[in-house]
Amino acid sequence: MKKLNLVVVFNQKMNQVLFCIRAKEPYKGLYNFVGGKVENGESNDDAAYRELFEETGIGRNDIELEHFMDLNYFKYENNLQVYVGVLTRDVELVEEKNKLEWVMIDNGLLDINKFAGNYNIPHIVKQIQVYLENGM
């Protein structure tokens, strides 16, 4: 299976999540978490930090990432590794290819016409919120 990652970034108040607006397929024009491919010979953790930095400018000094869960998509032969982190300080975002936007956590995450992932995004965010509330 091809290894991919998603990085879910919360602001310090934990009331907003960072999204990119996809510039290409799949999900072109929709909000999605940042992330990308795990390169050959690269650790999963290093790949998550690399993708986060490349796409947002957020580095290891700004956030501590934790591997949260994996989703396997057998039809596409993808192993999607979900990482989560809360910013430790204010950061200035640096956009790579996709526009970046902070989105308030509310029921708007359920809009399938706005968010990628066929309703996976609100499920992932809710599971992470429960996890963080119980002490990450």
Q: What is the role of each PLM region?
A:
Residues 15-16, 54, 89:
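Glycine-centered loop/turn positions within well-structured domains
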Residues 108-112:
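A generic structural signal for short hydrophobic patches within well-formed alpha-helices
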